[in-house]
């Protein structure tokens, strides 16, 4: 069986009862994480969110779904687009490192918008178990396509694989038959957004590609359910996703994972910092050296990071004057300088004063990223770091796994620290009672009667 047929069969037949306790727990955790990250995107540190919000309203009126935090009513397509931008706009959303896919950024906004729309338009509320199942379907489709790639990315895989997965997830949310689900995925393929050019330039359009992918998934479902006929061999056909967009691919590992019924949410990593994931290990190592050795920024002569080629491709870009926050989030030299001055990189690390700080620029110019011999085009580990001090010391540290990954998972306390850090940066204040209510609901997501009740907790009504 090809991966195409295996994935579609999996998406059409997976049931809540098939999921392990570990998969259900991981779903709760990453729904919590992704919602919190999206809520933080409403804050002033992501000003372009207002542009996306205005565009969503200009593209059409509707009341079937809502914007997170601020609560404006929108068509499901508009809500998916806006909330998708909020989730990915600060590089703080979770990532499936083997696939190099940020699955939840596209998937969760699309599924939540579709769930609200189904309840509002058809009086058919979507419960927590259905949402959990649909999220797992979507993440499995997105990431199993991603792990099949064998060449460096040319197209923005998080948006593309995310759209394909989200379309399958929405179809599962509606309990669609196998034929309709297939049409939804195929129609999503017809709308795939995103190249790596936005990443190379550090453009905020990178997150917009995720937003458009989330919108495309909802659009695909609405066409599919009405019977619109798409091309069907869109994953492995002559001009299907894998041969056209990825070029080199091997579906063997994905087929093996499906045969073993391995939930891909168990392979998803938290983002510990609001930066590119390829920069996480470097920040983590420098934080250790800073604390262990009592280092100050003035003590450092140079920093050398030994890393796989993907790290160099994604985050070894130079510091430059007047860089945008979207560029700085992917600029490892700037991020390491911020670690030395602030202790860690948080959501407030990208203000104009910090971006123009000459001390950061000075250290950034003395950071090098060099190959470590890895030939895996998708690997982010292992990595090692050598810091040379002005008094001649050579300090070294290494990581076999990235912080937040399944091999080095965040503790519950660290997860809650991130949750609260995100809500602290939302556009409207979330008091302790609202935060606890939201956490209680998320911790019992499988007991949720209606996804709209969860969205209610994401919104602060104006006083």
Language-model segments: residues:
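Active-site nucleophile and cofactor-binding loops and adjacent substrate-binding regions
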Residues: 99-105, 130-135, 151-163, 206-212, ...
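Amphipathic alpha-helical interface segments
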Residues: 104-109, 157-173, 183-253
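Short, charged, amphipathic alpha-helices and their helix-cap/turn boundaries
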Residues: 72-91, 130-145, 180-191, 244
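Hydrophobic alpha-helical hairpins/lids featuring a short glycine-rich hinge
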Residues: 86-145
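Well-ordered alpha-helical scaffold segments within catalytic/enzyme domains
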Residues: 39-41, 111-120, 167-173, 220-223, ...
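Structural helix-adjacent loops and short alpha-helical linkers that scaffold large soluble proteins
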Residues: 118-132, 175-182, 229-233
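Terminal-appendage/accessory-domain detector
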Residues: 1-100, 205-215, 222-463
